[in-house]
Amino acid sequence: MVASDEILKRTSDQYRRIRNTFRFILGNLNDFNSNDRINHENQVELDKWIIDEVINLEKKVINSYETYSYHKAVQSIHNFCVNELGGIYLDIVKDRLYTCKNNSIARRSCQTSLDILLNKLIKLISPILSYTSEEIWQLCPSLLEQEDSVFLSNFSDNNEKISMKIDSGEWKRIFEIK
């Protein structure tokens, strides 16, 4: 195995990006609990889109784990955090999170999506970032309500309930304009 300062720096940067994504999500769920969830049908379209994207990511990462392609799993998670979350979704929803009333439908819709993202992403990183995922799990009361540890939780669940067919081609055209 080859190791160099460049590889270690790149790995550190990937870890930092993933960790900071979780920090942002956790910071915006501090006043949110499961009673505040919005039904998927009533969510803002952008929030539906990101849920659909994380479900697609989940399938891809699980397939990578099943074929022992851990590098592909890491790359997929990192690219999702950088491109879909950092590059699009989180940048757009900041205004809603910071300016809307605490109990507004728009803010709760976003927080519902962030809660789903947290739940899915933490399970996806657990095989590769075990200490980080467990630390996040222990800090989040809504996750502790499910199980005592991320490693005792079901890896994939509830996709049938929340997955709706989203026209991803339409969203790609919108993001190209951006």
Predicted regions and their residues:
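Conserved phosphate-binding loops in nucleotide/dinucleotide-binding enzymes
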Residues: M1-D13, T67, H71-K72, S163-F175
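Catalytic adenosine-cofactor/nucleotide-binding cores of aminoacyl-tRNA synthetases and other
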Residues: M1-E41, S142-V150
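Acidic, turn-prone loop/beta-hairpin segments
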Residues: F32-K59, D91-K178
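Aromatic-lined ligand-binding clefts that engage carbohydrates, nucleic acids, or primary amines
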Residues: V74-N79
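ATP/adenylate-binding site constellation spanning eukaryotic-like Ser/Thr protein kinases
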Residues: V82
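Active-site-proximal binding-pocket segments
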Residues: I88
